[in-house]
Amino acid sequence: MVLIVFGLVVLRGFEQGDIKPLFLATPTPTRTFNSYAQEGEVHFKVGNLKKAIESYQMATTLDPNNADLWAELARIQVYSSAMKSTDAEKLAALQAGLASADKAVEVAPGSSNAHAFRAFVLDWNANPSLVGAEEAQKMLTRAEQEALAALQIDPANGLAMAFYAEISTDQLKMDQAQRYIAMAMEAAPEQMDVHRIQGYVWETLRQYSLAIQEYKLAVDIMPNMTFIYISIGKIYRHLQLWPQAMDYFAKAASINQQIGVNDPIPYLALANTYTQQGFFREASMNMQKALSLDPGNPDVYAQLGIVYQRARNYEGAIPAFECALRGCDAVKSCEVRMCDDANNPAITLPGLPLSDNTVVYYYTYGSVLSGLHKQGDNYCVQAVQVFDEIRAKYGDDEAIMRIVNVGMDICGNT
């Protein structure tokens, strides 16, 4: 009788969960949002923005009402857009950042930081080449309103001051920009963003030495922010200080290699720098390296076409432009990439649409086709198609139309 009662007690214990069966596997600890947030912060500081985004996305899944997590995710998503080379990729990153910033304000409308980061995100989204001039102006106005809301909630918010300075710079309100970035430097000199924006203000004012100085301070704080190295290199290139420019582009490439990021942008920057100096062999080598890192990116094929055109390798430029602008199959893309096996990997490309950022590729492609035209080929047929597309969208742009008209004249069309 005692054994029966004992058995019933044990059975009830199993059913209620008070008694656990022997030899159960040790339960795996459940990760907290804070664990993912800390991981994301580390990835961001290291410079691996892709992994940082993934970690913060996990953190927001576990704690969806944490405005700070959404704001930080938005910040990183927007900065990741600086490491994209196509309009579509940039826009996708910026729109993802805007969705995260909107969520931050939604869950914490009284948070100064939430409004500050939303201002920053709106400003970066206000790119006329991506969203059109009218929409860009609307976004700039909204960005200004968000920055003012952040400062109304917390007048001492240094990041809000800095973001307002960046917005003011994009509005060409330079006196206001200088005033607010000076305030930000006093309030938050430890922030990478503050020095980056001070550098941007100086660069806009063509104070290039001061801009470089501030950008360098920004990477002193966060040494693996490769897009800032690219900004420094571009200023040196503008000043025709070629060794310094290439040094900073090479540093960006080296950092990416160390942290395992396959980013073609440093190699594209190196290639363009070599092209400007007339070193086309070195430029082509760097373009091919960029292609090996991102073989599915049509913008890289287009930039390779530009290098070939500048080097007067017109026969090489045509297939590169064709892949970039019209799309191509795995065999054609392999030909452009100079690979051994079209199926390893098998890369098919969509064409880049005509836009403010790609029109230079289109008219260069058309010019190469018309310039190589010989009786009996169809190069002029293709060239006229390209020029007609350009004319339909940019017929009022005199500079572009001068180039188009030269090509049309060659092909006997006016």
How would you name each of these model-derived features?
Residues 33, 67-68, 112-116, 158-159, ...:
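Helix-start (N-cap) detector for alpha-helical repeat units in TPR-like alpha-solenoids
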Residues 31-62, 79-90, 159, 163:
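Alpha-helical segment of the N-proximal tetratricopeptide repeat
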Residues 41, 75, 79-82, 120, ...:
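Residue-level recognition of tetratricopeptide repeat
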Residues 45, 79-80, 124-125, 170-171, ...:
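Register position in tetratricopeptide repeats
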Residues 62, 107, 153, 187, ...:
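Structural marker of alpha-solenoid helical repeat scaffolds
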